[in-house]
């Protein structure tokens, strides 16, 4: 069922993420809401990010970690965190909740708060952030599209006996909190996870212990271990609530030739398992395309004589158009005004062309995209789109980066 955007109440709730790396992972969108919200609630991973939020906020700030306590059930803390934000929403304030990482990934109070706010008739939305998994992809250097990827929370994996796939990448979250419902993290139940991993992969298979660096002074943890190593007390002591396991694929998943033929893919079994570069973590059985094989050398040789397609479009927009689009992206209050009275905002913006005004007044992505791009020949000849052509423009699909060559 689609979420209704029609509300009759003044309070609003936005939930955002601060990412993992201190300050650096805060998006421009999140920063704009920090600057403009009446109330900013946060639970972040380091004091530098906390200071950055407080220094940039124009409203009042509140640290939600106050609701944690050593032997207190975490669920109770989450309910309280959610409710204090909702109280300000109900009081008519613009409320921002900032959570460590991605606000919707392994975060309970964010989803609860948004659902309750919407049920009560308030505007509520979530902004994306950089999760531990995003950071892990970058640091460990693998693409989940190659081999596929499964992702589980450690305790849930065990309790619900979720399937692990030896032919895919596997990510296991919160390995330092197996069976823990409070704030006491002693790894007392960690051996149960090791039993499961040994059963599915064997004792000699690789597991990478990962923790993304937070402060500028922090060092990223990327420790390559075997599953057998996980039974050593000195190793177990290294795991904490921010620890994540990456388990690379052990087995090759062979192509189904009959399906490959139906898809028009010839010689599927001879294709490399992955594009260059080879994984740092998988074994030698996984073949990889060469960095400079015959095909690569051939296409590289064509770079200097390459000519762009005649229908290739480049950025072509007035200074006013570019500034207004930037402001709409980074100024929540202006965006709200634009959506409430589009024509007034457009008319108040000087320097727009007739086509740009027409596109903006339609408040549709397709026309806006169309008037901001043009072919070099159209620019040289002074050809402009007609208003009818602008109105009929549709939003182009994003370019696809295909896995197989």
UniProtKB/Swiss-Prot annotation:
Keywords: Methylation, Methyltransferase, S-adenosyl-L-methionine, Transferase, Virulence. The active site is at residues 74, 78, 100. Residues 251-375 are annotated as: Clasp domain. Pfam families: TP_methylase. The modification N-methylleucine is found at residues 402-404. One of its GO terms (molecular function) is methyltransferase activity. This is Methyltransferase/ribosomally synthesized type I borosin cyclic peptide precursor pocMA. It comes from Porodaedalea chrysoloma (Phellinus chrysoloma). The lineage of its organism: Eukaryota, Fungi, Dikarya, Basidiomycota, Agaricomycotina.
